[in-house]
């Protein structure tokens, strides 16, 4: 079976790539005040790119337990509502509205309701400030890397309109909530305000962080496609832009507690079936979750923002046909099932830091490293999983039986736990990843005390705020930790590492950064 690969999008999209490259070469972004930015086709008007974030609670920072990106990022913006911050509807021409540098919180944090509509919809650290920082940083770093963007910044303008605990039937066009209407309001207001600042506002991408509420909604993929098409049509009418507006999303893995999630598969398939329009940026099972095991910690929202920025930059600015680590074909030869993958950054590898799923429940798959196989007889025992270039070869203990049901290959789709288990190996989890070396704008150097032979790093109280399990750790300007050392547990002032310290006992400066490897999407496919 083959999965269709995404291909280059429309001519207007390619024209915009050339436009952005030209704008950046001319000195786009990175300014301290409105007026800095890119240029349009006539070489005179700066272009500021809009990012619209919609979804449910993970799109608005629920359970982040604090704020990290609180310092305004120069050259990237959000809409300030002034005296209108708690009212709706709002007139896009209201003089209370203004542009301010993006920082967390996006607006005043709501502490009284878990599912409030825009503009009182913010619950903590969103991914947007980290995304803005990463877009600017990655653009500056792209000089000489084939991106044609010349080492200058990228001005982004962020809108956060999602509503916690809400189905796509709430946030879509004509939905029962106001998220979609708020998107159009912000786009209208920003078009006016950015023009007054001497630039032009165009929507760069819509980011959809969603799916838990609709975990068992059969129409989810079609609903995503409709949302993208509606956004593109309505936003183009407001901004006057002609290029496509991609929708970029990630998969959810927490819901349902029992059974399998149609929204998880739908989020991946939407990118496969709607090339150039929808892009799945990958899964989130590899993230560190809050104590409720459905939301993320503050630093992990930032990790998500870095990944969103990387994917959006590859698609829109560099014009690359970015795809996640996803299956593109399955073949069966006797008792071996070969799953071939598109690999963003080879080589493939296994994440050994947190163990393998299905060690107690669904034990037939305990050697599958996240892979799951079923046929007419039920669960098929996996005897081993081996990396062979871009292919995973799965050994099974008998020939497949397809007399009454197809041979199904799944990955990170079934959990062992009987409660919410986001980020745990007892939840929906997998170990396969690529080798993306990206160091995000959320990286931070921390002075630690190390003990030779110990896996513990100790720092001053509060120094580890915003860091979490799954972070990568390196020694700054020295040695003492092997490559790919990972934080396996994080306390208030103690980080437990996956590898022991090999240097002498004493102080060391360590760099903690989010893990930006691309992990394999959760999927299910019928083998031929």
Model-derived features: where do they sit?
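C-terminal motif of bacterial Sec signal peptides marking the signal peptidase cleavage site
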Residues: 25-27
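Cell-envelope and extracellular/periplasmic
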Residues: 38-448, 492-494, 500-528
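Bacterial N-terminal signal peptides that target proteins for export
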Residues: 2-17
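Autoprocessing Asn-cyclization modules and mimics
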Residues: 339, 440-504
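Intrinsically disordered, low-complexity regions enriched in serine, threonine, proline
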Residues: 1, 12, 506-510
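Bacterial signal peptide processing site
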Residues: 29-32
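Hydrophobic helical h-region of N-terminal Sec-dependent signal peptides
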Residues: 19-23
């Amino acid at each position: 079976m083959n999965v269709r690969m995404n291909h280059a999008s429309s001519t207007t999209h390619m024209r915009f790539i050339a436009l952005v490259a030209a704008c950046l070469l001319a000195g786009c972004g990175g300014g301290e005040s409105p007026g800095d930015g890119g240029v349009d086709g006539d070489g005179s008007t700066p272009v500021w790119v809009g990012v619209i974030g919609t979804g449910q609670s993970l799109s608005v920072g629920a359970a982040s337990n604090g704020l990290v990106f609180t310092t305004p990022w120069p050259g990237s913006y959000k809409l300030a509502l002034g005296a209108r911050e708690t009212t709706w509807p709002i007139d896009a021409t209201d003089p209370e509205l203004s542009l301010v540098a993006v920082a967390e919180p996006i607006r005043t944090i709501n502490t009284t309701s878990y599912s409030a509509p825009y503009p009182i919809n913010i619950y903590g650290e969103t991914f947007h400030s980290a995304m803005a920082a990463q877009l600017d940083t990655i653009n500056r770093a792209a000089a000489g890397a084939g991106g044609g963007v010349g080492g200058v910044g990228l001005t982004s303008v962020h809108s956060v309109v999602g509503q916690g605990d809400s189905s796509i039937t709430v946030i879509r066009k004509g939905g029962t909530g106001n998220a979609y209407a708020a998107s159009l309001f912000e786009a209208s207001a920003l078009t006016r305000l950015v023009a007054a600042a001497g630039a032009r506002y165009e929507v760069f991408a819509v980011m959809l962080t969603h799916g838990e509420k609709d975990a068992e909604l059969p129409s989810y993929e079609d609903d995503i496609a409709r949302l993208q098409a509606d956004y593109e049509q309505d936003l183009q009418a407001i901004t006057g832009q002609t290029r496509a507006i991609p929708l970029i999303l990630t998969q959810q893995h927490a819901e349902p507690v029992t059974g399998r999630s149609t929204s998880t598969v739908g989020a991946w398939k939407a990118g496969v079936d709607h090339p150039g329009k929808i892009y799945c940026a990958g899964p989130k099972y590899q993230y560190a979750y809050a104590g409720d095991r459905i939301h993320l910690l503050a630093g992990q929202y930032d990790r998500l923002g870095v990944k969103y920025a990387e994917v959006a930059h590859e698609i829109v600015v560099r014009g690359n046909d970015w795809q996640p680590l996803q299956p593109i074909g399955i073949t069966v030869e006797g008792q071996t099932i070969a799953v071939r993958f598109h690999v963003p950054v080879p080589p493939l590898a296994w994440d050994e830091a947190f163990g393998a799923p299905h060690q107690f429940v669904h034990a037939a798959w305990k050697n599958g490293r996240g892979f799951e196989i079923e046929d007419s007889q039920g669960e098929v025992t996996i005897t081993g999983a081996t990396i062979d270039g871009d292919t995973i070869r799965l050994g099974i203990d008998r020939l497949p039986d397809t007399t009454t049901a197809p041979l199904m290959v799944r990955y990170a789709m079934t959990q062992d736990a009987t409660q919410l288990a986001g980020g745990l190996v007892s939840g929906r989890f997998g170990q396969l990843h690529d080798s993306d070396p990206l160091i995000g704008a959320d990286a931070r150097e921390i002075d630690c005390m190390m003990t030779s032979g110990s896996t513990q790093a100790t720092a001053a109280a509060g120094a580890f705020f915003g860091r979490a399990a799954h972070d990568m750790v390196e020694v700054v300007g020295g040695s003492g930790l092997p490559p790919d050392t990972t934080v396996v547990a994080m306390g208030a002032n103690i980080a437990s590492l996956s590898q022991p310290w090999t240097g002498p006992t004493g102080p060391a400066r360590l760099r903690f950064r989010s893990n930006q490897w691309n992990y394999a999407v959760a999927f299910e496919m019928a083998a031929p």
